[in-house]
Amino acid sequence: MKKYRRGLRLAACLLALATCAVLLCSCLHPGKADSYTAAMPVIVVGSDNYPPFNYMGTDGAPTGIDVELATEAFGRLGYRVKFVTIDWEKKKELVENDTIDCIWGSFSMDGREEEYQWAGPYLYSRQVVAVRSDSDIRTLQDLAGKVVAVQSTTKPEELFLNAEQNGLPRLRRLYSLQNRDLLYTTLLKGYADALAAHESAIRQFMKDYSVEYRILDEPLMTARLGVAFAKERGDDLPQQLTEVFQEMLADGTVRQIVSR
């Protein structure tokens, strides 16, 4: 009987050790804890297709600089991210009626500080003008009397609609397009003399489609990119996210993601 009891105790000890080993392996490999990740609260992020910041990968899932930054930043705060494609013109309405939790899509904070609660900046981006390689447009002042294409509700649109107070010349026509992909077609086909957008997005398009545009040396502005939450949001998530951005900038995470 004593031998039997000793055998039971030994078996119990071995089972306990095996259980500890499994738990230790789970701790050492948190990325495999799918059930834990699935239990995390979800943040719904609204964006639109804008390579290299946000676009659909070959597997059909959202990818890009903003997607990776959002996944890392919200992950540090204990959230799981779900990116949804939105009508960019309705972004403010969507965040205010809680259809989405925030707007994250290479979104400029400048001039919009009072419209939203902001987290950031997490990056800085130049808003620039691009022309065809054979164009005689060399400076911003050369845009006088020309046709320029922009995406509607963006910072370049705002700058050109208020051209005089922003030190920009009077255009012959400003095309404000809902679909930003049409910007490049409009310029390529000669319907516009120039387009204005984030420099990184223009360079990504040229790389993806082997197209050569010339970017003017003088930028329209250098924009602070941030994450926009509803103005009336009642918690401190925007401030928490700003603090995480500061950590990610300090520890090199942002630089690592952007340089991939």
Task: Label every model-predicted segment.
Residues G7-C20:
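Sec-dependent N-terminal signal peptides
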Residues L23-S26:
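C-terminal motif of bacterial Sec signal peptides marking the signal peptidase cleavage site
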Residues L28, V67-R76, D134-I137, Q141-K155, ...:
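Extended ligand-binding regions for polar small-molecule ligands
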Residues D34-S106, S176, Q240:
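Extracytoplasmic small-molecule ligand-binding "clamshell" domains
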Residues S47-N49, Y124-V131, K207-Q246:
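Periplasmic-binding protein-like
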Residues V67, T71, R80-D142, R214-P219:
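Acidic, polar ligand-binding/catalytic clefts
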Residues A70-Y79, P156-L177, M206-S210, S259:
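Ligand-binding cleft/hinge of the Venus flytrap
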Residues K90-E93, S106-E115, L159-N162, T186-M221:
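A ligand-binding cleft/hinge motif common to bilobed small-molecule-binding domains
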